[in-house]
């Protein structure tokens, strides 16, 4: 197993490149929350796989970001990267401790399952209120 250590402004981000059957693991401190489904670990942007949070100008957008800031900002996370990339972001499932960040924000009613990418693993955590208030983007279907 190879390990690459990146130092970024007094911050350590550690990436383990596993074998072909295991995901690449990135660990580090969350330095910025862009919105409800995108965080930055060190200077590396991560898009939460299978999670669709509202944009900042949409209903619940600012609440979803505030929830995410409270949950992860300044905390150590572990992200299992899929190998995919969207825009400038790597894609992965991230955990703070044993808590799946995607499960947490969807259970709170501030994001939806994006079944095209999640395989439906978060659907059971969606709330009725979120289903009424958040518009699922076409790319999630």
Predicted feature descriptions by range:
Residues 1-7:
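Sec-dependent signal peptide recognition
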Residues 2, 12-141:
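Small beta-barrel nucleic-acid-binding modules, primarily SNase/OB-fold domains
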């Amino acid at each position: 197993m190879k390990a690459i250590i990146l130092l970024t402004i007094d911050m350590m981000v550690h990436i383990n490149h596993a074998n072909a059957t295991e995901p690449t693991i990135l660990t580090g401190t969350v330095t910025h929350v862009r919105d409800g489904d995108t965080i930055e670990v060190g200077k590396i942007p991560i898009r939460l796989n299978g999670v669709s949070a509202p944009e900042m100008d949409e209903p619940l957008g600012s609440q979803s970001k505030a929830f995410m800031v409270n949950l992860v900002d300044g905390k150590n996370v572990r992200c299992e990267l899929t190998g995919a990339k969207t825009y400038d972001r790597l894609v992965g499932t991230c955990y703070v401790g044993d808590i799946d960040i995607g499960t947490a924000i969807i259970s709170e009613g501030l994001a939806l399952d994006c079944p095209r990418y999640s395989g439906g693993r978060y659907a059971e955590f969606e709330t009725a209120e979120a289903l009424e208030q958040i518009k699922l983007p076409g790319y999630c279907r």
